């Protein structure tokens, strides 16, 4: 049983989109990865339309169970952050039109999920994406690898929980193999989940 997630690394010039199938044992398989590009000289409304059409086509072609988008965070370049926010809005709207659940994940959440370290650099994330997916190298440009990381992050952080009650979600795939070996990233994330669970279950002392 698998969950299919479409991940989006929003950007106006380059919007990375990656689709992965993730089994209940957290093994991930690459389905598709691409980058939607729009030229800077194109009118803004046409650029957003092109990105929206590209995302819509991929949603309709691969029928994911969920969509995951990188959450906008503060950047020094105001024009860049505005473009990212605009594309994020288009992606949210396009997914909502199809009744798909959408999750937003911060860069730190994605890094922690993929590498086990929330301050990992881009090269470390890209290397782990390639390793998790069994690829000889990370897809290029970086926007493509980032989109895959976002999709994997969502599946590992909560998307797989639906499998425990509803069976296969999204595209059909091979059944999970109980007790299968985890990748280093998967093992680190599972250990982090256990640590978080222990911490959250302990009584908290009120501040004085």
Curated annotation (Swiss-Prot):
Transmembrane in keyword set: no
The protein's role, per its UniProt record: The RuvA-RuvB-RuvC complex processes Holliday junction (HJ) DNA during genetic recombination and DNA repair. Endonuclease that resolves HJ intermediates. Cleaves cruciform DNA by making single-stranded nicks across the HJ at symmetrical positions within the homologous arms, yielding a 5'-phosphate and a 3'-hydroxyl group; requires a central core of homology in the junction. The consensus cleavage sequence is 5'-(A/T)TT(C/G)-3'. Cleavage occurs on the 3'-side of the TT dinucleotide at the point of strand exchange.
Pfam families listed in its UniProt record: RuvC
Name under which the protein is recorded: Crossover junction endodeoxyribonuclease RuvC
Main location as per UniProt: cytoplasm
Lineage of origin: Bacteria, Bacillati, Actinomycetota, Actinomycetes, Micrococcales
Required co-factors: Mg(2+)
Cell cycle keyword on record: no
EC number(s) on file: 3.1.21.10
Parts forming coiled coils: none
């Amino acid at each position: 049983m698998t969950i299919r997630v479409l991940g989006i690394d929003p950007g106006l010039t380059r919007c990375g989109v990656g689709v992965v199938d993730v089994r209940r044992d957290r093994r991930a398989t690459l389905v598709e990865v691409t980058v939607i590009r729009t030229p800077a000289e194109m009118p803004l409304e046409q650029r957003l339309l092109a990105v929206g059409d590209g995302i819509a086509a991929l949603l309709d072609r691969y029928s994911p169970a969920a969509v995951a988008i990188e959450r906008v965070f503060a950047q020094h370049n105001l024009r860049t952050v505005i473009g990212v926010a605009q594309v994020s809005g288009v992606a949210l709207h396009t997914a909502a039109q199809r009744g798909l659940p959408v999750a937003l994940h911060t860069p730190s959440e994605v890094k922690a999920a993929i590498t086990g370290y929330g301050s990992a650099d881009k090269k470390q994330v890209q290397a782990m994406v390639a390793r998790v997916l069994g690829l000889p190298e990370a897809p290029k440009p970086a926007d493509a690898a980032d989109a895959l990381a976002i999709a994997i992050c969502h599946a590992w952080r909560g998307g797989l929980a639906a499998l425990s009650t509803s069976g296969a979600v999204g595209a059909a795939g091979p059944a999970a193999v109980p007790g299968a070996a985890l990748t280093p990233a998967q093992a680190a994330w599972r250990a982090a989940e256990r640590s978080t669970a222990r911490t959250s279950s302990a009584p908290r002392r009120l501040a004085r």
